[in-house]
Amino acid sequence: MDRHRRHFSIRPFNACLSGTLCRTFRLHFVVTPALFLASNSYSLSRSLSWNS
């Protein structure tokens, strides 16, 4: 019973934490590939113009 009560009291904090982590992860998931693609296409276009 005591363990159940403790688990119940920690659950809202857990949900909040997972929500924050999920939001942060989603932000990274969107931003990181965008930056990677931008730098990649930039270096690719540079190497292409350098080659031709």
Curated annotation (Swiss-Prot):
Induction: Expressed approximately equally in exponential and stationary phases (at protein level). Transmembrane segments: none annotated. Pfam families: YoaL (PF22867). It comes from the Bacteria. May serve a regulatory role in expression of downstream gene yoaE; in a yoaL-yoaE-lacZ fusion mutation of the start codon to a stop codon in yoaL decreases expression of beta-galactosidase, suggesting translation of the 2 genes is coupled. This gene lies upstream of and overlaps yoaE on the same strand in another reading frame. This is Protein YoaL.
